[in-house]
A protein has these predicted regions:
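Short, thiol/selenol-centered motifs that function as redox-active sites or metal-ligating centers
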Residues: 51-62, 85, 169-179
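N-terminal targeting signals for export/organelle localization
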Residues: 1-28
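A short beta-strand-turn-helix
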Residues: 20-44, 63, 69-71
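Structural microenvironment flanking redox-active thiols in thiol-disulfide oxidoreductases
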Residues: 58-93, 99-109
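Thiol-/selenol-based redox modules, centered on thioredoxin-like
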Residues: 127-128, 132-179
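Short active-site neighborhood of thiol/selenol oxidoreductases, capturing the structured segment around
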Residues: 36-64, 77, 151
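Structural micro-motif
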Residues: 95-97, 112-119
């Protein structure tokens, strides 16, 4: 089992046919998909796409916890769980506000097709980053901490241009995103 999973999750997640990923800078209307508290309006939002069934989601929990600890006063962190789960109440243990993407429409609108993935939106809900947390499975390569780099750029008023490695998904396919 170990070797099977090691090989499986070291390869990119197959890209679904017909996948549409909105370009960075695209505004996203969240009003019909997420019930965001008024206090979150105008604040950057990090959507952490997570599945407790995905080993890769569990591998990056410590890294996400570090991001949360460092940026929680400046960025709102949310966890998005996939729809068809018998135990959708299981979470990452990070204490994040959870949203269940009941019909997969949020993931589809943002171009997300696997977990773990992150989408960083600015205060006007424009996509500023979509992709991996790191090229390393355990998020241990500081030079490729893509989400951290995107957050730092956003908070500094700069645009982050992610390298191609940041957008190649590794992990578990979402149920409605089969290749």
């Amino acid at each position: 089992v170990f070797w099977d999973q090691d090989v499986r999750y070291s390869l990119p997640t197959p890209t679904p046919q017909g996948l549409e990923q909105p370009p960075l800078g695209t505004p996203v209307d969240l009003s019909t998909r997420l019930a965001l508290p008024a206090a979150w309006q105008g604040r950057p939002l990090l959507l952490h796409f997570y599945s407790p069934d995905c080993p890769c989601s569990r591998f990056n929990a410590d890294h996400v916890a570090g991001l949360l600890q460092r940026y929680r006063d400046q960025v709102v962190f949310c966890e998005v769980l996939e729809a068809d789960r018998a135990h959708a109440d299981e979470d990452s243990g990070l204490g994040l506000r959870q949203f269940v993407d009941a019909d997969g429409s949020l993931a589809a609108a943002l171009g997300v097709y696997s977990t773990p993935q992150a989408v960083l939106l600015d205060g006007q809900h424009r996509i500023r980053f979509r992709g991996n947390y790191n090229t390393s499975r355990y998020c241990s390569d500081r030079n490729t901490e893509f989400v951290r780099l995107a957050i730092e750029a956003l908070l500094a008023g700069q645009t982050y241009e992610p390298p191609p490695a940041a957008t190649v998904s590794y992990g578990c396919e979402l149920p409605d995103a089969e290749a």
